[in-house]
Amino acid sequence: MAMAVFKAPLKGEFHGARKMEGKQYKHHLLQQQSTGRRRVFVQTDTGCVLGVELDRNDNVHTVKKRLQIAFNFPTEESSLTFGDMVLKNDLSAVRNDSPLLLKRNLMHRSSSTPCLSPTGNDLQRKDRSGPIEILSHSPCFLSLKQTANDIVKAMKMGVEPIPVNGGLGGAYYFRDEKGQSVAIVKPTDEEPFAPNNPKGFVGKALGQPGLKPSVRVGETGFREVAAYLLDYDHFANVPPTALVKITHSVFNVNDGMDGNKSREKKKLVSSKIASFQKFVPHDFDASDHGTSSFPVASVHRIGILDIRILNTDRHGGNLLVKKLDDGGVGRFGQVELIPIDHGLCLPETLEDPYFEWIHWPQASIPFSEEELDYIQSLDPVKDCEMLRRELPMIREACLRVLVLCTVFLKEAAVFGLCLAEIGEMMTREFRAGEEEPSELEMLCIEAKRLTTEQDVLSPKSDGEGETEFQFDIDYNELDSVYGSETETDEFFAKNPFSNGRSSLGELKESIAEEEEDDEEEAKLTLSLSKLSTSMKNNLSNTMGSGYLKPPKDNQTDKALVSHKSANVQLPLSVNFVKLADMKEVEWVVFLERFQELLYSAFAERKTMTLRNTQRLGTSCKF
């Protein structure tokens, strides 16, 4: 099987930005670099936000000092972080419009020290920005600038936002002068388990493992933006989305988080970092109606995006449906699908995705030529470059997941697999209530074994292969949730996870394990030929516990009744494969071995499909 060659990216700037706008953006970047002046947004791990103007002379100490003055926030035992990087003193790596996180060091997180939110004249004196500030000057977000302007005008006229009742996190409909919803805003500090969650799901600081351990609290916002940026030419119809700093009194601040015992007497103005998504009028969502009338092309396009970004939460509630015509009496007319809620995509490790479309008949229809051309035009390397440029806080671990899943998609499409087959290979199975690795994860396990084997047979010369991505910031927090080594041979050898839920405290106590002898590991290593689907049946006795998916919208009300903290509610999620522990040289070799293994895996999957002549969708006509 020929290796997929990464072709040039799609013609033109993403989302059809005009060339002149792109030139203006580059000129803006050059001007910022020459003057050294930048505007950044510093957020504490309790949710307080301050816009800060930097010049060449500023450093980490001066930024902390400003935060201390503005919020009465203790900064002695804290770290200023920028994505994967812990900033020591130099701020030269920090880009204009970047959000930074000031977090207390692990040993000091138990003492919850609130920050005092500036209000009224204090807020105006310490941060002179407007009510809504988009955290980028990229032409990708031009359409949202007008939306933001419309909202600001409405705010001045007294038009108030409307809190969204559904969901586990805080969200707000912001309206224009006519009172019509034009954007939905989700503050990062109101996510599930974040400090200011308005629905009782609290217990964690920003930057700690969240609803899914591989997606940290406060980091779903930039994932929403990443999904929009990766949806080139609006192929999957993701609504325009940006990160913003937004100020309003409607936002929730839990008691103690802003230094006030009660906010009932006077609603205080709060500044938040939030995702800002254009509101799309629609008639219902996919869970409200049968899916058989959904366009094949729309299902395929959304599925292609979900596979690329390893969406772990694609259910009917986050697929909006807009009717294009009535279809006549007794008929269902044409519809348009709008995918939303991408905050649980691009996890830091391979997770079990959730693709509700996987059993829809449309997913079993072969890709069209247009879809195949689109897939083959995707370039994961350039995707990563673009995301680093537009979302400099994104973690390298997330980008590795993007690269791996895009390579898998491209090779599978070339081989002739349909959307359902690709999705099934990425999805884990449960046997007797126990979770097994997906076929994709098994391929990764074997590719890592071959990479390690090549490393042993071809030792590096001194000084070679020293380059390594920055995964230094609190990656041990993810390890403490998953277990420091829960993959490959070691997992099969000695990790029979218990069934049921476990709190974070219990998980941390269960990760202390000794390493196996090399001889034992060699005996337990499984070759690819043994990792077939039939072999998986024999492995179920050694696999881990089941994984509980986030509740759908129609399950929200029951979930909200408990009001339990994160330590009680987080289930144990098994991690079979970790990509971030490889050095850059190892990562390149791993991808080569991974691609070499794909042909036989795809051939076996195709054989299985041909055996199943009664497969769902073969008799459907569209």
UniProtKB/Swiss-Prot annotation:
Region (G-loop) location: 164-170
GO molecular function: 1-phosphatidylinositol 4-kinase activity; ATP binding
EC number: 2.7.1.67
PROSITE patterns on file: PI3_4_KINASE_3
InterPro entries in UniProt: P4KG1-8 (IPR044571), PI3/4_kinase_cat_dom (IPR000403), Ubiquitin-like_domsf (IPR029071)
Region (Catalytic loop): 310-318
Domain (Ubiquitin-like): residue spans on this chain: 38-95
Pfam families: PI3_PI4_kinase
The PI3K/PI4K catalytic domain, residue ranges: 158-459
Residues binding ATP: N165, G166, G167, L168, G169, G170, A171, K186, Q277, K278, F279, V280, D341
Keywords: ATP-binding, Kinase, Nucleotide-binding, Phosphoprotein, Transferase
Keyword Electron transport among record annotations: no
Catalytic activity: a 1,2-diacyl-sn-glycero-3-phospho-(1D-myo-inositol) + ATP = a 1,2-diacyl-sn-glycero-3-phospho-(1D-myo-inositol 4-phosphate) + ADP + H(+)
Sites bearing Phosphoserine, chain numbering: S565
The UniProt record lists the keyword Transmembrane: no
Region Activation loop, annotated ranges: 339-365
Family indicated by similarity: Belongs to the PI3/PI4-kinase family. Type II PI4K subfamily.
Function: The phosphorylation of phosphatidylinositol (PI) to PI4P is the first committed step in the generation of phosphatidylinositol 4,5-bisphosphate (PIP2), a precursor of the second messenger inositol 1,4,5-trisphosphate (InsP3).
The protein's name in its UniProt record: Phosphatidylinositol 4-kinase gamma 6
Gene: PI4KG6
